[in-house]
């Protein structure tokens, strides 16, 4: 990745995207991802991190198997190519169709190529239609080694431990925790946001301190056709302290500098 302009201090500048990801609209979501990559480029970032299932939107494979996509799908490959055009790497989410199975997957692309994937190793409620990933991936990114934790994986130790044991120096937590019941006013949005702040951000803080690693979060935000998501983009330091974050549940992006020494 020579020529990508990593920071002189050895750190990595990252854009964390808490965006709305429409269900069943890979092309529309692709356009939004490309816009975010351009925003990241203009902000001097080397990496953009997107939420769980960001490209496909959340998918229930038992009900809508047609919304899951293979890794060679045009939208997956086009987004990988866009990382070369923007000179910004990307970690993005999809519901992956793999032969007769489905996985919840984060794909890492850089320099115009799909480099590798992390499949979800610990499933949450209502995810029985998915297969469990068995491998732990770590992606080299300049001076950083990136591990990935996907939503419900944050609530257990073994996924974090496996990524740390594989050499991850920075852990990226990508989530799409659908809220039970629609959000219809500010009070209901705030209630869902507070739950995820306590649960999701709380897990990020606990594991950051336990493992002595930086943790960066990107969560789906806003309303889709039949489900709402609580947002939160944040950076947590190795002591478990939140050093940067978006203020509430609304969609947005957050640029952070992560030390790697």
Regions from the language model: what does each represent?
Residues 124-137, 152-158:
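Active-site glycine-rich loop that binds ribose-phosphate moieties when present
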Residues 92-94, 104-108, 137, 233-235, ...:
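Short beta-strand scaffold segments in enzyme catalytic cores
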Residues 11-23, 105, 117-119, 138, ...:
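Active-site-proximal beta-strand elements of phosphoester/diester hydrolases
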Residues 106-115, 236-243:
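Short, glycine-anchored, charge-dense loop/turn motifs used at functional sites
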Residues 120-133, 249-261:
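A short, polar/charged loop-to-alpha-helix boundary motif
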Residues 29, 40-67, 90-91, 153, ...:
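Active-site beta-strand/loop signature of hydrolases that rely on acidic residues for catalysis
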Residues 1-47:
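N-terminal glycine-/serine-/threonine-rich phosphate-binding loop
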Residues 71-89, 155-251:
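CN hydrolase (nitrilase-like) catalytic-core segments centered on the catalytic cysteine
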């Amino acid at each position: 990745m020579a020529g990508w302009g990593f920071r002189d201090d050895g750190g990595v500048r990252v854009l964390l995207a808490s965006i709305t990801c429409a269900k069943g609209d890979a092309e529309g979501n692709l356009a939004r991802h490309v816009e975010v990559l351009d925003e990241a480029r203009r902000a001097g970032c080397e990496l953009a991190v997107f939420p769980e299932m960001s490209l496909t939107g959340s998918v229930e494979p038992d009900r809508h198997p047609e919304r899951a996509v293979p890794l060679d799908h045009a939208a997956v490959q086009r987004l990988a190519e866009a990382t070369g055009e923007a000179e910004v790497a990307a970690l993005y989410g999809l519901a992956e169709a793999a032969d007769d199975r489905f996985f919840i997957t984060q794909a890492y692309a850089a320099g115009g190529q799909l480099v590798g994937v992390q499949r979800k190793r610990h499933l949450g409620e209502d995810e029985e239609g998915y297969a469990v990933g068995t491998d732990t991936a770590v992606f080299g990114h300049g001076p950083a080694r990136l591990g990935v934790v996907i939503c419900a994986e944050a609530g257990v130790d073994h996924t974090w431990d496996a990524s740390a044991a594989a050499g991850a120096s920075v852990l990226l937590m990508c989530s799409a925790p659908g809220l039970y019941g629609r959000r219809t006013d500010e009070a209901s949005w705030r209630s869902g946001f507070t739950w995820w702040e306590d649960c999701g951000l709380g897990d990020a803080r606990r594991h950051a301190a336990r493992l002595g690693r930086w943790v960066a979060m990107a969560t789906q935000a806003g309303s889709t056709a039949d489900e709402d998501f609580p947002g939160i983009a944040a950076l947590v330091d190795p002591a478990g302290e939140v050093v940067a974050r978006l203020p509430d549940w609304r969609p947005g992006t957050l640029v952070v500098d992560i030390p790697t020494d």
